[in-house]
Design a protein with these regions (language model features):
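Helix-loop boundary and gating motifs at the non-cytosolic
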Residues: 23-74, 236-273
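Cytoplasmic helix-loop-helix junction between adjacent transmembrane helices
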Residues: 125-157
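Central cavity-lining transmembrane alpha-helices of secondary-active solute carriers
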Residues: 68-85, 275-287
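Hydrophobic core of transmembrane alpha-helices in multi-pass small-molecule transporters
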Residues: 38, 107, 117-134, 245, ...
Length: 368
Protein backbone atom coordinates (compact mmCIF):
# COMPACT_ATOMS: atom_id res chain seq x y z
CA UNK A 1 0.00 0.00 0.00
CA UNK A 2 1.02 3.59 -0.52
CA UNK A 3 0.70 4.32 3.20
CA UNK A 4 0.60 1.41 5.69
CA UNK A 5 -2.85 1.11 7.26
CA UNK A 6 -3.57 4.47 5.67
CA UNK A 7 -7.35 4.40 5.96
CA UNK A 8 -7.28 3.44 9.63
CA UNK A 9 -4.66 6.11 10.38
CA UNK A 10 -6.77 8.81 8.73
CA UNK A 11 -9.96 7.62 10.43
CA UNK A 12 -8.29 7.69 13.84
CA UNK A 13 -6.72 11.09 13.22
CA UNK A 14 -9.97 12.54 11.90
CA UNK A 15 -12.05 11.14 14.76
CA UNK A 16 -9.67 12.48 17.40
CA UNK A 17 -9.49 15.93 15.87
CA UNK A 18 -13.18 16.32 15.12
CA UNK A 19 -13.81 16.08 18.84
CA UNK A 20 -11.38 18.96 19.48
CA UNK A 21 -12.32 21.12 16.49
CA UNK A 22 -14.47 23.57 18.40
CA UNK A 23 -11.92 23.94 21.20
CA UNK A 24 -8.89 24.31 18.94
CA UNK A 25 -10.58 26.62 16.46
CA UNK A 26 -13.16 29.19 17.50
CA UNK A 27 -15.70 30.55 15.06
CA UNK A 28 -13.80 33.85 14.81
CA UNK A 29 -10.58 32.07 13.92
CA UNK A 30 -12.35 29.94 11.35
CA UNK A 31 -13.79 33.05 9.68
CA UNK A 32 -10.33 34.64 9.60
CA UNK A 33 -8.76 31.58 8.00
CA UNK A 34 -11.53 31.29 5.42
CA UNK A 35 -11.19 34.99 4.59
CA UNK A 36 -7.42 34.57 4.24
CA UNK A 37 -7.90 31.80 1.69
CA UNK A 38 -10.60 33.74 -0.13
CA UNK A 39 -8.44 36.84 -0.58
CA UNK A 40 -5.22 34.98 -1.38
CA UNK A 41 -6.66 32.99 -4.24
CA UNK A 42 -8.78 35.84 -5.54
CA UNK A 43 -5.64 37.94 -6.00
CA UNK A 44 -3.97 35.03 -7.80
CA UNK A 45 -6.78 34.48 -10.27
CA UNK A 46 -7.70 38.04 -11.13
CA UNK A 47 -4.40 38.78 -12.90
CA UNK A 48 -2.67 35.46 -13.58
CA UNK A 49 -5.50 33.67 -15.40
CA UNK A 50 -5.85 36.24 -18.22
CA UNK A 51 -2.12 37.09 -18.38
CA UNK A 52 -1.26 34.84 -21.34
CA UNK A 53 -4.02 36.37 -23.44
CA UNK A 54 -2.84 39.89 -22.53
CA UNK A 55 0.77 39.11 -23.43
CA UNK A 56 0.01 37.48 -26.77
CA UNK A 57 -3.02 39.37 -28.05
CA UNK A 58 -2.47 42.89 -26.69
CA UNK A 59 1.28 43.31 -26.24
CA UNK A 60 1.95 41.07 -29.25
CA UNK A 61 4.96 39.42 -27.59
CA UNK A 62 6.73 36.61 -29.38
CA UNK A 63 5.73 33.08 -28.35
CA UNK A 64 9.07 32.47 -26.62
CA UNK A 65 8.70 35.77 -24.73
CA UNK A 66 5.23 34.79 -23.52
CA UNK A 67 6.66 31.47 -22.33
CA UNK A 68 9.47 33.22 -20.46
CA UNK A 69 7.11 35.62 -18.70
CA UNK A 70 4.80 32.78 -17.71
CA UNK A 71 7.76 30.80 -16.36
CA UNK A 72 7.78 33.34 -13.54
CA UNK A 73 5.45 31.03 -11.62
CA UNK A 74 8.10 28.30 -11.54
CA UNK A 75 10.82 30.81 -10.66
CA UNK A 76 8.70 32.18 -7.82
CA UNK A 77 8.03 28.69 -6.48
CA UNK A 78 11.77 28.29 -5.90
CA UNK A 79 11.49 30.76 -3.02
CA UNK A 80 8.76 28.77 -1.24
CA UNK A 81 11.02 26.48 0.79
CA UNK A 82 13.30 29.36 1.79
CA UNK A 83 10.38 31.48 2.99
CA UNK A 84 9.03 28.41 4.78
CA UNK A 85 12.36 27.99 6.58
CA UNK A 86 12.21 31.65 7.67
CA UNK A 87 8.66 31.17 8.97
CA UNK A 88 9.70 28.01 10.83
CA UNK A 89 12.54 29.84 12.61
CA UNK A 90 12.36 33.61 12.82
CA UNK A 91 9.07 35.39 12.15
CA UNK A 92 5.37 34.82 12.66
CA UNK A 93 3.89 33.37 9.49
CA UNK A 94 1.02 35.87 9.32
CA UNK A 95 3.48 38.81 9.40
CA UNK A 96 5.54 37.32 6.58
CA UNK A 97 2.33 36.77 4.61
CA UNK A 98 1.33 40.43 5.00
CA UNK A 99 4.74 41.72 3.87
CA UNK A 100 4.79 39.41 0.85
CA UNK A 101 1.32 40.55 -0.21
CA UNK A 102 2.34 44.21 -0.01
CA UNK A 103 5.42 43.53 -2.13
CA UNK A 104 3.40 41.51 -4.64
CA UNK A 105 0.94 44.38 -5.00
CA UNK A 106 3.74 46.89 -5.53
CA UNK A 107 5.37 44.80 -8.27
CA UNK A 108 2.00 44.26 -9.97
CA UNK A 109 1.49 48.02 -10.11
CA UNK A 110 4.86 48.33 -11.82
CA UNK A 111 4.14 45.42 -14.17
CA UNK A 112 0.85 46.97 -15.29
CA UNK A 113 2.75 49.99 -16.60
CA UNK A 114 5.23 48.01 -18.71
CA UNK A 115 4.72 47.38 -22.41
CA UNK A 116 8.11 45.94 -23.41
CA UNK A 117 9.38 42.45 -22.68
CA UNK A 118 12.40 42.93 -20.39
CA UNK A 119 10.92 45.29 -17.76
CA UNK A 120 7.63 43.38 -17.78
CA UNK A 121 9.46 40.09 -17.30
CA UNK A 122 11.43 41.55 -14.39
CA UNK A 123 8.32 42.89 -12.65
CA UNK A 124 6.33 39.67 -13.07
CA UNK A 125 9.23 37.55 -11.78
CA UNK A 126 9.61 39.78 -8.71
CA UNK A 127 5.85 39.63 -8.13
CA UNK A 128 5.85 35.82 -8.31
CA UNK A 129 8.92 35.51 -6.06
CA UNK A 130 6.80 37.25 -3.44
CA UNK A 131 3.49 35.63 -4.30
CA UNK A 132 4.25 31.93 -4.73
CA UNK A 133 5.50 31.39 -1.14
CA UNK A 134 2.18 32.76 0.15
CA UNK A 135 0.36 29.67 -1.08
CA UNK A 136 2.33 27.37 1.20
CA UNK A 137 2.25 29.93 4.03
CA UNK A 138 -1.55 30.08 3.98
CA UNK A 139 -1.66 26.28 4.19
CA UNK A 140 0.75 26.30 7.14
CA UNK A 141 -1.24 28.98 8.97
CA UNK A 142 -4.55 27.19 8.39
CA UNK A 143 -3.27 23.79 9.52
CA UNK A 144 -1.65 25.36 12.60
CA UNK A 145 -5.06 26.42 13.85
CA UNK A 146 -7.31 23.60 12.68
CA UNK A 147 -6.97 19.81 12.36
CA UNK A 148 -5.27 19.10 9.04
CA UNK A 149 -8.07 16.76 7.95
CA UNK A 150 -10.41 19.76 8.09
CA UNK A 151 -8.05 21.81 5.92
CA UNK A 152 -9.87 21.01 2.63
CA UNK A 153 -12.98 22.78 3.92
CA UNK A 154 -10.95 25.86 4.85
CA UNK A 155 -9.11 25.70 1.53
CA UNK A 156 -12.47 25.59 -0.27
CA UNK A 157 -12.81 29.31 0.36
CA UNK A 158 -9.72 29.82 -1.77
CA UNK A 159 -11.71 28.31 -4.61
CA UNK A 160 -14.61 30.63 -3.77
CA UNK A 161 -12.18 33.56 -4.02
CA UNK A 162 -10.82 32.28 -7.32
CA UNK A 163 -14.34 32.11 -8.76
CA UNK A 164 -15.25 35.48 -7.26
CA UNK A 165 -12.33 37.06 -9.13
CA UNK A 166 -14.55 36.88 -12.20
CA UNK A 167 -16.62 39.69 -10.68
CA UNK A 168 -13.96 42.17 -11.82
CA UNK A 169 -14.50 41.10 -15.41
CA UNK A 170 -18.29 41.26 -15.07
CA UNK A 171 -18.16 44.76 -13.54
CA UNK A 172 -15.75 46.01 -16.21
CA UNK A 173 -17.78 44.68 -19.14
CA UNK A 174 -21.38 45.01 -17.97
CA UNK A 175 -21.37 47.77 -15.34
CA UNK A 176 -18.59 50.08 -16.53
CA UNK A 177 -19.30 49.09 -20.17
CA UNK A 178 -15.65 48.72 -21.07
CA UNK A 179 -14.95 47.03 -24.39
CA UNK A 180 -12.40 44.59 -22.90
CA UNK A 181 -10.93 43.45 -19.60
CA UNK A 182 -9.01 40.17 -19.88
CA UNK A 183 -6.87 41.50 -22.74
CA UNK A 184 -5.86 44.67 -20.87
CA UNK A 185 -3.60 45.59 -17.94
CA UNK A 186 -6.64 46.19 -15.70
CA UNK A 187 -6.40 42.70 -14.12
CA UNK A 188 -2.95 43.62 -12.78
CA UNK A 189 -4.30 46.78 -11.16
CA UNK A 190 -7.17 44.78 -9.66
CA UNK A 191 -4.71 42.15 -8.42
CA UNK A 192 -2.60 44.84 -6.74
CA UNK A 193 -5.66 46.30 -5.00
CA UNK A 194 -6.67 42.88 -3.67
CA UNK A 195 -3.06 42.33 -2.48
CA UNK A 196 -3.14 45.45 -0.33
CA UNK A 197 -6.54 44.61 1.19
CA UNK A 198 -5.35 41.04 1.87
CA UNK A 199 -2.21 42.37 3.61
CA UNK A 200 -4.33 44.45 5.99
CA UNK A 201 -6.48 41.43 6.82
CA UNK A 202 -3.38 39.25 7.29
CA UNK A 203 -2.37 41.40 10.26
CA UNK A 204 -5.58 40.27 11.99
CA UNK A 205 -4.90 36.55 11.53
CA UNK A 206 -4.33 34.31 14.58
CA UNK A 207 -0.72 34.41 15.71
CA UNK A 208 1.37 31.64 14.15
CA UNK A 209 4.80 31.83 15.80
CA UNK A 210 7.97 30.10 14.60
CA UNK A 211 8.06 26.42 15.55
CA UNK A 212 11.86 26.30 15.93
CA UNK A 213 13.96 28.16 18.51
CA UNK A 214 15.88 31.04 16.91
CA UNK A 215 19.04 29.81 18.62
CA UNK A 216 18.92 26.73 16.41
CA UNK A 217 20.15 28.89 13.54
CA UNK A 218 19.66 28.25 9.87
CA UNK A 219 21.91 26.17 7.63
CA UNK A 220 22.62 26.25 3.92
CA UNK A 221 20.34 23.21 3.65
CA UNK A 222 17.53 25.23 5.20
CA UNK A 223 18.15 28.26 2.99
CA UNK A 224 18.02 26.16 -0.16
CA UNK A 225 15.05 24.18 1.12
CA UNK A 226 16.99 20.92 0.89
CA UNK A 227 16.31 20.06 4.54
CA UNK A 228 12.74 19.16 3.61
CA UNK A 229 14.11 16.54 1.21
CA UNK A 230 14.89 14.44 4.30
CA UNK A 231 11.18 13.55 4.31
CA UNK A 232 11.82 11.55 1.15
CA UNK A 233 13.69 8.95 3.19
CA UNK A 234 10.19 7.62 3.75
CA UNK A 235 9.52 5.43 0.70
CA UNK A 236 5.81 6.24 0.67
CA UNK A 237 6.43 9.97 0.70
CA UNK A 238 9.16 9.62 -1.92
CA UNK A 239 6.71 7.92 -4.29
CA UNK A 240 4.17 10.66 -3.63
CA UNK A 241 6.66 13.43 -4.43
CA UNK A 242 7.75 11.75 -7.67
CA UNK A 243 4.11 11.43 -8.74
CA UNK A 244 3.53 15.07 -7.83
CA UNK A 245 6.53 16.18 -9.88
CA UNK A 246 5.25 14.30 -12.93
CA UNK A 247 1.64 15.41 -12.49
CA UNK A 248 2.42 19.09 -12.07
CA UNK A 249 4.06 19.40 -15.51
CA UNK A 250 0.82 19.19 -17.54
CA UNK A 251 -1.11 20.82 -14.68
CA UNK A 252 0.96 24.00 -14.98
CA UNK A 253 0.63 24.03 -18.76
CA UNK A 254 -3.14 24.26 -18.26
CA UNK A 255 -2.80 27.24 -15.92
CA UNK A 256 -0.22 28.99 -18.07
CA UNK A 257 -1.75 28.54 -21.52
CA UNK A 258 -5.42 27.97 -20.73
CA UNK A 259 -6.45 31.57 -21.34
CA UNK A 260 -4.46 31.71 -24.59
CA UNK A 261 -6.14 28.57 -25.94
CA UNK A 262 -9.61 29.88 -25.12
CA UNK A 263 -8.76 33.25 -26.66
CA UNK A 264 -7.69 31.48 -29.87
CA UNK A 265 -11.04 29.66 -29.83
CA UNK A 266 -12.82 33.04 -29.47
CA UNK A 267 -14.34 32.16 -26.09
CA UNK A 268 -15.87 35.20 -24.36
CA UNK A 269 -15.25 36.02 -20.66
CA UNK A 270 -12.17 33.81 -20.37
CA UNK A 271 -11.74 34.29 -16.61
CA UNK A 272 -15.37 33.36 -15.94
CA UNK A 273 -15.13 30.31 -18.22
CA UNK A 274 -11.98 29.00 -16.55
CA UNK A 275 -13.61 29.58 -13.18
CA UNK A 276 -16.03 26.74 -13.93
CA UNK A 277 -13.17 24.51 -12.82
CA UNK A 278 -13.06 26.30 -9.49
CA UNK A 279 -16.81 25.87 -9.06
CA UNK A 280 -16.30 22.13 -9.38
CA UNK A 281 -13.28 22.40 -7.09
CA UNK A 282 -15.44 23.93 -4.35
CA UNK A 283 -17.70 20.88 -4.38
CA UNK A 284 -14.89 18.35 -4.34
CA UNK A 285 -13.00 20.15 -1.57
CA UNK A 286 -16.10 19.81 0.62
CA UNK A 287 -16.07 16.03 0.16
CA UNK A 288 -12.27 15.51 0.04
CA UNK A 289 -12.17 14.74 3.77
CA UNK A 290 -14.80 12.02 3.38
CA UNK A 291 -12.99 10.55 0.38
CA UNK A 292 -9.71 10.49 2.32
CA UNK A 293 -11.39 8.61 5.16
CA UNK A 294 -13.23 6.08 3.01
CA UNK A 295 -10.65 5.50 0.28
CA UNK A 296 -7.31 6.33 1.88
CA UNK A 297 -4.57 8.56 0.53
CA UNK A 298 -3.41 6.13 -2.17
CA UNK A 299 -6.81 5.80 -3.86
CA UNK A 300 -7.57 9.51 -3.41
CA UNK A 301 -4.39 10.42 -5.28
CA UNK A 302 -5.12 7.84 -7.99
CA UNK A 303 -8.59 9.31 -8.54
CA UNK A 304 -7.00 12.73 -8.95
CA UNK A 305 -4.46 11.45 -11.48
CA UNK A 306 -7.18 9.75 -13.53
CA UNK A 307 -8.91 13.13 -13.69
CA UNK A 308 -5.66 14.60 -15.06
CA UNK A 309 -5.76 12.12 -17.94
CA UNK A 310 -9.42 12.95 -18.62
CA UNK A 311 -8.63 16.67 -18.74
CA UNK A 312 -5.88 16.47 -21.34
CA UNK A 313 -7.68 13.88 -23.42
CA UNK A 314 -10.63 16.30 -23.53
CA UNK A 315 -8.45 19.22 -24.61
CA UNK A 316 -6.79 17.09 -27.29
CA UNK A 317 -10.13 15.91 -28.68
CA UNK A 318 -11.49 19.46 -28.57
CA UNK A 319 -8.50 20.76 -30.53
CA UNK A 320 -8.74 17.98 -33.11
CA UNK A 321 -12.50 18.10 -33.64
CA UNK A 322 -13.21 21.79 -33.03
CA UNK A 323 -15.95 20.88 -30.54
CA UNK A 324 -15.71 23.44 -27.73
CA UNK A 325 -17.71 21.43 -25.22
CA UNK A 326 -14.72 19.09 -24.83
CA UNK A 327 -12.83 22.08 -23.42
CA UNK A 328 -15.56 22.51 -20.84
CA UNK A 329 -15.15 18.88 -19.75
CA UNK A 330 -11.42 19.50 -19.31
CA UNK A 331 -12.10 22.63 -17.29
CA UNK A 332 -14.70 21.06 -14.98
CA UNK A 333 -12.56 18.05 -13.98
CA UNK A 334 -10.11 20.56 -12.49
CA UNK A 335 -12.07 20.21 -9.26
CA UNK A 336 -11.27 16.50 -9.05
CA UNK A 337 -7.61 17.06 -9.84
CA UNK A 338 -7.04 19.84 -7.36
CA UNK A 339 -9.24 18.60 -4.55
CA UNK A 340 -8.15 14.97 -4.56
CA UNK A 341 -4.54 15.11 -5.69
CA UNK A 342 -3.09 18.44 -4.64
CA UNK A 343 -5.05 19.32 -1.49
CA UNK A 344 -5.00 15.67 -0.44
CA UNK A 345 -1.23 15.85 -0.88
CA UNK A 346 -1.02 18.92 1.36
CA UNK A 347 -2.87 17.07 4.11
CA UNK A 348 -0.55 14.09 3.70
CA UNK A 349 2.51 16.36 3.86
CA UNK A 350 1.30 18.03 7.04
CA UNK A 351 0.82 14.64 8.69
CA UNK A 352 4.26 13.40 7.63
CA UNK A 353 6.37 16.51 8.35
CA UNK A 354 7.74 17.10 11.88
CA UNK A 355 6.60 20.24 13.67
CA UNK A 356 9.84 22.12 13.04
CA UNK A 357 9.63 21.54 9.28
CA UNK A 358 5.94 21.94 8.41
CA UNK A 359 6.19 25.30 6.63
CA UNK A 360 9.33 24.25 4.78
CA UNK A 361 7.73 20.93 3.75
CA UNK A 362 4.70 22.73 2.33
CA UNK A 363 7.11 25.06 0.53
CA UNK A 364 8.90 22.09 -1.02
CA UNK A 365 5.58 20.67 -2.21
CA UNK A 366 4.67 23.97 -3.88
CA UNK A 367 8.17 24.21 -5.36
CA UNK A 368 7.64 20.88 -7.13
Amino acid sequence: TFVPCETQVIKTFYSNNMNTLTTKQGIGTKVQLCTMMFMQYMLSAVWWVPLAAYLSHTLKLEVYQVSLVLSAMAIGAMASSFIGAIADRYFAAEKILAVLNILTGAFLLLAAQQTSFVPLMACVVLAMLCHMPTQSLTSTIAMSHTPSEQFPRIRMFGSVGWVASGIFSVIALHVMHLSAFDDTNLPMYCGAAVCFVAALLNLRLPHTPPSVDKSAGISVMDITGFSAFSLMKDKNYRVFMILTFLAIIPFNLYHVYGSMILADEHVQNITVTLNLGQLAEMFFLVITTSILIKSGIKNTLIFGMIALVVRYASFYIGAETGLQWFYYIGIIVHGLIFGLFFVGGQVYTDNVAPKEMKAQAQGLLFFL
